């Protein structure tokens, strides 16, 4: 199984070790699924960790490197423009499409989750994903 994990889920996995988002990343670490990310997602991760959380550059780079090592990195070619309010969210959708993933996992309840799917790819929250694929967690 292949998944794209939105930036907000990556950040949650760093903040709440052992939490739901971290359980998703643990599935990747354990080899139970593949995570597909794009350069945009990694750059956005670095930007948020630097600007919002004010982490030092070394800690930010360490986090980005960790996810980059775990992930398959794709370069989306198709342009998606379905989210008008926050256009950068379209880059997450493009990654999922380019990676031919089975699920897009996000915590974005305002822009991404309401879409429910994109080009046949289900869009789900972390808890929903874990309930479906790891009952009992």
Spans of features found by a protein language model:
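Acidic, PIN/NYN-like endoribonuclease modules and their adjacent C-terminal/linker elements
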Residues: 83, 90, 97, 102, ...
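Short secondary-structure boundary segments
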Residues: 7, 39, 107-109
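PIN/NYN-family metal-dependent endoribonuclease catalytic core
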Residues: 5, 15, 20-50
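Acidic catalytic patch
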Residues: 40, 61-83
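Residues at secondary-structure transition points
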Residues: 19, 36, 58, 62, ...
């Amino acid at each position: 199984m292949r998944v794209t994990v939105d930036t907000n889920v990556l950040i949650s996995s760093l903040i709440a070790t052992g939490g739901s988002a971290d359980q998703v990343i643990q599935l990747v670490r354990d080899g139970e699924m593949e995570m597909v990310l794009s350069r945009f997602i990694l750059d956005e991760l670095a930007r948020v960790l630097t600007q919002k959380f004010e982490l030092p550059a070394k800690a930010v780079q360490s986090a980005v490197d960790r996810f980059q090592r775990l992930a398959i990195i794709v370069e989306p070619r198709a342009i998606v423009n379905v989210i008008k309010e926050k256009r950068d969210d379209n880059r997450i959708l493009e990654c999922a499409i380019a990676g031919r993933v089975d699920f897009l996992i996000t915590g974005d309840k305002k822009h991404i989750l309401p879409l429910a799917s994109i080009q046949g790819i289900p869009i789900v929250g972390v808890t929903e994903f874990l309930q479906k694929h790891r009952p009992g967690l």
